[in-house]
Amino acid sequence: MSTIEQSAKGKKDGDIRYLTPLNIETNKTKKYCRFKKSGIKYIDYKDADFLLKFVNEQGKILPRRLTGTSLKYQRKVSVAVKRARHLALMPYVADLLK
């Protein structure tokens, strides 16, 4: 038997199977809005260190499903990040921000 026939009959351990779904373990814990939890009403656009928690390495604003913030405070975070970018407190685009 040639190696092609053997590989067709028996699958090797290192083969990639595209048709089967990957078993990715996700974090099952519930995410809570840190602003509601601590009672923060105003998000300061001048606090760039705090706003860096809500952007990724490229400088893009992280979505709600990753940060766990509520819709109301996600809008306030996005406005604060955009204001900080406009005043050059935060970069618009970065190669590696963190």
Curated annotation (Swiss-Prot):
It comes from the Bacteria. Pfam families: Ribosomal_S18 (PF01084). The keyword Glycoprotein does not apply. Gene3D superfamilies: Ribosomal protein S18. GO terms for molecular function: small ribosomal subunit rRNA binding; structural constituent of ribosome. The keyword RNA-binding applies. Keywords: Ribonucleoprotein, Ribosomal protein, RNA-binding, rRNA-binding. Binds as a heterodimer with protein bS6 to the central domain of the 16S rRNA, where it helps stabilize the platform of the 30S subunit. NCBIfam families: S18. Belongs to the bacterial ribosomal protein bS18 family. Part of the 30S ribosomal subunit. Forms a tight heterodimer with protein bS6. This is Small ribosomal subunit protein bS18. It comes from Flavobacterium johnsoniae (strain ATCC 17061 / DSM 2064 / JCM 8514 / BCRC 14874 / CCUG 350202 / NBRC 14942 / NCIMB 11054 / UW101) (Cytophaga johnsonae). The lineage of its organism: Bacteria, Pseudomonadati, Bacteroidota, Flavobacteriia, Flavobacteriales. The gene is rpsR.
